[in-house]
């Protein structure tokens, strides 16, 4: 059969960042990992998917793909995306409910959607059911350790690049420094620029409540990951005692985790990441659930792919992440009139510049 999976090839790249980027929980980043998976069918057609990490785990993801997932998928019908998604989930469920397993699943699933789009002549935003190919976008800095002057210059760079929304990292050892930095950013950008903050789950519930109350006067759109993402009831306690809406989602890897968050965490925004929640199939499942709860669907990272998904729902915000995967593709993210624009090319709209990234393969 022409759509039978004939071959799957996975590659790992370690791509250096232009400068050290830091947050409150992951520490310093000097590179990110990109794991690509290319699926070839009997008729010779190919689709490429991918996932990424902040610098750790890439070898493990590649190993799970090569030893556990890829051999089991040879001979399967690539058009049966939902069935393959379910198969992968249960094939490796016992050793990985989320985490490395869902990162690996994501790369394969995205490749299958790439094949689907190319076969049907449809871009991802249309395959996802969207009527629109643009969405709101904000720049998310990994800037916790930037001196204040550099932080403010960085924010100015975002605005000069055509964005009207920004997010900064918080979680410094001295909370007053966070408060002062938030105040300085708001004073710099004025009242009309959308402004978010992200603690990378570095605070206790009590600390998060204290900080939120201290900065609510600065018109913060959301407070992201104030505390551990597993502490759904802790999120609810923060929400019950503060005014700034809460956001999370990048550390939720299964539909069950999203379900717990919807039922318990009292979120204002949710941010699934297709690189780690089972690919496009997993992302759409999460997005449908989030939408049922009348919560805007936002994203984390991989803006070159997520622009199509956020545009399809058009309720939330696309994060333009500081890991610039899009700069290693043939079409870096396009921004017009403060909105990100999804590709109209059939497939996922992401084509890697293999010559550019070849030097970083390991």
UniProtKB/Swiss-Prot annotation:
Give any Pfam family that matches.
Answer: MR_MLE_N
Molecular function terms in GO for this entry? hydro-lyase activity; isomerase activity; magnesium ion binding
Annotated GO biological processes are:
galactose catabolic process
**What is the entry's stated biotechnological use?**
Could be used for bioconversion of red macroalgal biomass into biofuels or industrial chemicals.
Top-tier EC class: isomerase
- Physiological role: Involved in the degradation of 3,6-anhydro-L-galactose, which is the major monomeric sugar of red macroalgae. Catalyzes the isomerization of 3,6-anhydrogalactonate (AHGA) to 2-keto-3-deoxy-galactonate (KDGal).
Matches recorded under SUPFAM superfamilies: Enolase C-terminal domain-like, Enolase N-terminal domain-like
* Cofactors demanded by this protein: Mg(2+)
Q: Which family does it belong to?
A: Belongs to the mandelate racemase/muconate lactonizing enzyme family.
Return the protein name: 3,6-anhydro-alpha-L-galactonate cycloisomerase
Active site (record annotation):
169 (proton acceptor), 300 (proton donor/acceptor)
- Name of the gene: Vejaci
Q: Where does Mg(2+) bind?
A: 198, 224, 250
